[in-house]
Amino acid sequence: MDRRRAFGIVLVLVSACGFGSGGLFAHPVYEAGVGWQVLSAWRFGFGALLAWIWLLASAERRRGLGLVDRRTAVVAVALGVLYVGNSGTYYAGLETVPVGLAALIVYVYPAVVAVMTLRFGRRLDGRRPWFALGLALAGVVLALGGVPTGAMPPLSGVALIVASPLIYSVWIVLSARLSGEKRDAVGGERAEGTDAAAATALMMTGTAAVYWLSALFLGLPVTPDRIPGAAWPGLVGVGVVATFIAIQAFYAGVRRIGAAQAALVSTIEPAWTIALAALLFGQTLAPIQLAGGALIIIGVIIAQAPPEAFSSIRPGVRMADE
């Protein structure tokens, strides 16, 4: 393995662990009495600020921003607004759903995306996406079924967590169009599109604006003087590690190893979250829930693996990468 590829894998691992740490950082924030809306406002506030600093610090990235036309900029900001639906449902659900269980449920999104691309995305033929989605959903059923009756989270919290990957899947398909992906492109091919750093800064700005405006409109305690000191480490962590670093590391890793391989490497994310949730907060999963998690990850691997990986099983089936 060459050095560039190895570094790309490391970057994607860093990204997966960063994204997977979001719920872990949120836990002490909630315990300090800060709600999910305020957490999200600061999360994307920090993320957007750092994204713009990163963008403007490089002449090459500044040139990329200059090439973004008005329509593309509006679309990027609109995608940021749409991202509120995904992030909001997830972090609202985390107020009542254990972090490890939430991580398992949310990770069905790659299988959902694989099915959505049959109609709305890249060229993706055959029944494999449906099989992958079926495995992932069976895993969710096992994960929920393993919760003791007396410890079952509120249905509203579970519904919010389930809604998150569905909204995120729509967001992924739409943002792929913004990046220049063609509907008839085979997985792994990428057209020229909007500069990643510019698109990220614009999208996070849109997300941050919605959270901050809504928090101020609702009179939530979002200003620094109204936030408990115990909440700040978690707020900074979720904004820096789980947002800015995670996103930038993922883009950098994809450039080195490709989106398909990045998607497979990212399957470490739920395992990372579950392990740390057990270590830090004592939130352990039952064996049947871990079996459900294994089904979800297998479904993701089937959905995202390149076609040649299964050519001996069913020739002629093409798979797209995430």
Where are the predicted features?
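Loop-to-transmembrane-helix transition segments
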Residues: 7-15, 62-89, 128-133, 156-164, ...
